[in-house]
From Swiss-Prot:
Its EC number is 6.1.1.17. Pfam families: Anticodon_2, tRNA-synt_1c. It comes from Mycobacterium sp. (strain JLS). This is Glutamate--tRNA ligase. GO terms for biological process: glutamyl-tRNA aminoacylation. It comes from the Bacteria. Its main location: cytoplasm. GO terms for cellular component: cytosol. Keywords: Aminoacyl-tRNA synthetase, ATP-binding, Cytoplasm, Ligase, Nucleotide-binding, Protein biosynthesis. Catalyzes the attachment of glutamate to tRNA(Glu) in a two-step reaction: glutamate is first activated by ATP to form Glu-AMP and then transferred to the acceptor end of tRNA(Glu). The keyword NADP does not apply. A motif ('KMSKS' region) lies at residues 256-260. It is an enzyme of class 6 (ligase).
């Protein structure tokens, strides 16, 4: 399939919350399609009605939309190989099963698990070896007798009795030896198709040329190649796609990142205030890199450079600190207007209200853009503007609002009460004169008590700008309250 236009697919099952490893797979498929000018197909594997949910499906759509990973064919938009939800394709699978049986590529198997184990034990083999291909050559009479007993068969593919080898685009030449892979089930006993059937059949019918997926699926590849070869022989498939098995994503302690690990949950990162650019940049580094000396890049740059053969086969560790640092870099790369819009949307989504008008909010955003790692950090710096959220940090107050802060705050109040236009420049001039010149204080000793009294914290946006945003009346009221707190602590 080397000469065909690239067609890749992202085919999650709609169960649970989107996992960062799943989204990494989507990103690599998307980037490869965009790099090659190919097609990115989005398909939903919803054949397990007991586990699949519409809520999870909507969550996957939400994730793709938020990250900007647009697909060319799939649910919601359609395409030449619709439908793109497997639950709507059962007639297609039934037809393929019938054709495989008619061609002798697959057969009905009636053995129970207990019977298979008993045969292994009788032959002196490990009873847990799995299916033993016993039903391959049942006669019509034997099959009829099983049906008369009320047994429902599963359909199994007849595996070739030879090595199966392929050149994995990430891992190189890979071989599974003859006899290591028993005939495998394509359906359940009730006739429902299994993932082992529907995934390769859909890839064949949708003309998928490259399968980029997690390495946990590597052991299933020889079975799928055998099925592709059978599908070619019955005229369903044009060829066997190329495979690329992406490295595992590890969490703490060299364990594979699981859905139980908080950092695996895509939406927890969004809720903290990751922006798509930062998260996608970090996910791209889980197995790939744009250059040895460069970690920060945009999606357009990734598309221009990405080739799946450059993906590293070694496991990748999810490092939250590095992810945070990259997100901070991308926040700084946003224009001031874009950052303001992102921050305003984030605050609205999380119920944060600064009480500022648009111009004031833009100024507040400018003050915090270079001081945060995730958008959520901005609320910690700006919540002093919300009277309902303002709290005096006890540790900061114990350090800054002691008896020696009383004359500092008295002088600050006297200086500020004479300010005409309440602007950053006028506030700065008044405070520096009252405290640095008149009281001859060092800046930290002068401004520490004012910062804590006005913002409630020892860390805030620049002090003079913060007081302008807070406004004259609230600033003076908080300084008075801070002075009273310091006097009471004396």
């Amino acid at each position: 399939m080397n000469n065909m236009a690239v067609r890749v697919r992202f085919c999650p099952s709609p169960t649970g919350t989107p996992h960062v490893g799943l989204i990494r797979t989507a990103l690599f498929n998307w980037a490869y399609a965009r790099h090659t000018g190919g097609t990115f197909v989005f398909r939903i594997e919803d054949t397990d009605s007991a586990r699949d949910s519409e809520e999870s499906y909507q969550a996957i759509l939400d994730a793709l939309n938020w990250l900007g990973l647009d697909y060319d064919e799939g649910p919601e938009i359609g395409g030449p190989y619709a439908p793109y939800r497997q639950s709507q394709r059962r007639d297609l699978y039934r037809d393929v099963i019938d054709r495989l049986i008619a061609a002798g590529e697959a057969y009905e198997a009636y053995s129970t698990a207990e019977e298979v184990e008993a045969r292994h034990l009788a032959a002196g083999r490990n009873p847990k070896l799995g299916y033993d291909n016993f039903d391959r050559d049942l006669t019509d009479e034997q099959r009829a007798a099983h049906r008369a007993e009320g047994r429902n068969p599963v359909i199994r593919l007849r595996m070739p009795e030879r090595d199966i080898t392929w050149r994995d685009l990430v891992r190189g030449e890979t071989t599974f030896g003859a006899g290591t892979m028993p005939d495998f089930a394509l359906t359940r006993g009730n006739g429902e198709p299994l993932y082992t059937l529907v995934n390769p059949v859909d890839d064949a019918l949708m003309k998928i040329t490259h399968v980029l997926r997690g390495e946990d699926l590597l052991p299933s590849t020889p079975r799928q190649i055998a099925l592709y070869e059978a599908l070619i022989r019955i005229g369903v498939a044009d060829g066997v796609p190329e495979f690329a098995h992406l490295p595992s994503v590890l969490g703490d302690g060299n364990k594979k990142l699981s859905k139980r690990d908080p950092q695996s949950n895509l939406f927890l990162h969004r809720d903290r205030g990751f922006i798509p650019e930062g998260l996608l940049n970090y996910l791209a580094l889980l197995g790939w890199g744009i250059a040895d000396d460069r970690d920060v890049f945009g999606l357009d740059e990734m598309v221009a450079a990405f080739d799946v053969v450059d993906v590293n086969s070694n496991p990748a560790r999810f490092d939250q600190k590095k992810a945070d640092a990259l997100n901070a870099e991308h926040i700084r790369l946003l224009s001031e207007d874009e950052f303001t819009a992102r921050l305003k949307a984030y605050f609205a989504a999380h119920g944060h209200d600064t009480g500022l008008d648009d111009a004031q909010f833009a100024e507040a955003a400018r003050l915090v853009q270079t001081r945060i790692v995730v958008l959520g950090d901005a609320w910690g710096l700006l919540k002093f503007l919300d009277e309902g959220a303002f709290v005096l940090d006890e540790r900061a107050a114990a350090k800054e609002l002691k008896a020696d802060a009383v004359p500092v705050l008295d002088a600050a109040l006297a200086g500020l009460e004479g300010v005409g236009q309440w602007t950053t420049g006028a506030i700065e001039e008044a405070l520096k004169k009252a405290l640095l010149e008149d009281l001859e204080l060092k800046p930290r000793k002068a401004f520490g008590p004012i910062r804590v009294a006005a913002t409630g914290a020892s860390v805030s946006p620049p002090l003079f700008e913060s007081l302008e945003l807070l406004g004259r009346d609230r600033s003076l009221a908080r300084l008075r309250a801070g002075r009273d707190h310091a006097a009471a602590a004396a």
